[in-house]
C-alpha cells in the first residue's frame, strides 16, 4: 500500500527505538532518554509512539515478508508457546496483567501471559506474531463458586449457569496466530506445527486443520489420558510400562541427544481417532513424556527430532 509508508521522522524514531530495545533488552522510555544522553526526551519518544498513525500489525507482517523474500524461504515449521512475564504486584495500568501461579515458589504473582508464534527454517528462525492472554474475571469467579457448590453436593440444575466468556482462551488465540500467518503468506509451505502439552487436545487440532488441512500437528498428552489398545481403555503411562524403550540418537536443536523412545499408532479417547503416540525420555530423565502426531505416515524418529 503506497499510502502506508513511513515519514522520514518516523523512520528515524523507529530506528532509534529498535536499536535501544536491542541494546537494553527492555522497553523503557526513561532508559532510552538516558541512552541518548538526554538528546531524545522520554515524553517526546512516547508522544511519537502515541500520536503516530502507524499500522504496527502491517509493519510486522511487512518485516516478516521481507525476511522470507531476502532469505528465499519456501517452507518451515511453526512453533507455538507462551510465557509469563512477572510484573510488580502494585501494577494497575499494564494491559492484561493478572494473577498467575508462580512455578518456582508455588505461590502467586502478577504477570502478563504472552502467546507467540515462531517460524523455524533451515536458514533462520524468526518471530511471526504475539498476543496477550487475559482470563475472564467473571468466568473465573463463577468457576470458583461452581466448584464449591459441586463439592457441597448441589446438583447442576440448581447451580448458577456458566456465563459467556468475554475473552479468548489460549487455544483460540493460538489458532488465530496461525490463521493470520496463513492469510498473510498463503503460498508458504508449513511442514508441521509444534505446540506444548497445553495444546494437546482435539479443539486445538481441529482449529488448526481448518486453516492447514493436512498439516502435521506435534504436541503432547498427559500420562493419565485414556487410549484404546485392542478396544480396551488404558492410560497412556500404564500402556507404555508394558514395553521396553528403544535407545536412539536424535537431533535436538542442532545437537545429538541420546533418548529412550517407543511409539505406536493408537486411538486417543480425547481426540476420538488415532494418533501416533511416542513415549520419550532424554538421557538422565526418569519419566517419559508422551509426544503425539496427527499424521500417522511420519516415522517416529522424524517426529521427535
What are these regions (language model features)?
Residues 14-18, 114:
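Short, amphipathic alpha-helical segments that act as regulatory/interfacial helices
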Residues 1-9, 13-15, 36, 63, ...:
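Single, function-defining residue in the core of a domain
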Residues 5-10, 20, 24-91, 96-97, ...:
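Electropositive nucleic-acid engagement tracts
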Amino acid at each position: 500500500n503506497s499510502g502506508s509508508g513511513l515519514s522520514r521522522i518516523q523512520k528515524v524514531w523507529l530506528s532509534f527505538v529498535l536499536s535501544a530495545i536491542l541494546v537494553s533488552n527492555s522497553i523503557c522510555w526513561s532508559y532510552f532518554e538516558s541512552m541518548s544522553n538526554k538528546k531524545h526526551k522520554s515524553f517526546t519518544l512516547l508522544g511519537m509512539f502515541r500520536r503516530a498513525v502507524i499500522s504496527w500489525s502491517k509493519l510486522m507482517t511487512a518485516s516478516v515478508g521481507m525476511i522470507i523474500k531476502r532469505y528465499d524461504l519456501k517452507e518451515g515449521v511453526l512453533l507455538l508457546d507462551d510465557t509469563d512475564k512477572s510484573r510488580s504486584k502494585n501494577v494497575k495500568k499494564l494491559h492484561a496483567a493478572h494473577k498467575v501461579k508462580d512455578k518456582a515458589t508455588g505461590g502467586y504473582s502478577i504477570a502478563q501471559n504472552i502467546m507467540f508464534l515462531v517460524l523455524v527454517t533451515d536458514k533462520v528462525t524468526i518471530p511471526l506474531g504475539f498476543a496477550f492472554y487475559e482470563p475472564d474475571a467473571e468466568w473465573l469467579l463463577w468457576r470458583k463458586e461452581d466448584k464449591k457448590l459441586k463439592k457441597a453436593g448441589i446438583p447442576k440444575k440448581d447451580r448458577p449457569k456458566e456465563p459467556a466468556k468475554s475473552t479468548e482462551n489460549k487455544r483460540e488465540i493460538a489458532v488465530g496466530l496461525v490463521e493470520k500467518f496463513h492469510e498473510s503468506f498463503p503460498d508458504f509451505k508449513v511442514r508441521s506445527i509444534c505446540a506444548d502439552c497445553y495444546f494437546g487436545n482435539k479443539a486445538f487440532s481441529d482449529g488448526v486443520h481448518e486453516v492447514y488441512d493436512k498439516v502435521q500437528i506435534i504436541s503432547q498428552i498427559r500420562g493419565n489420558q485414556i487410549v484404546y489398545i485392542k478396544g480396551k481403555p488404558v492410560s497412556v503411562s500404564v500402556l507404555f510400562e508394558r514395553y521396553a524403550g528403544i535407545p536412539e540418537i536424535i537431533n535436538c536443536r542442532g545437537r545429538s541427544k541420546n533418548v529412550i523412545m517407543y511409539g505406536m499408532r493408537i486411538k486417543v479417547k480425547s481426540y476420538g481417532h488415532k494418533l501416533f503416540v511416542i513415549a520419550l525420555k532424554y538421557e538422565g530423565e526418569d519419566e517419559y513424556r508422551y509426544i503425539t502426531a496427527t499424521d500417522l505416515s511420519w516415522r517416529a524418529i522424524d517426529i521427535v527430532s
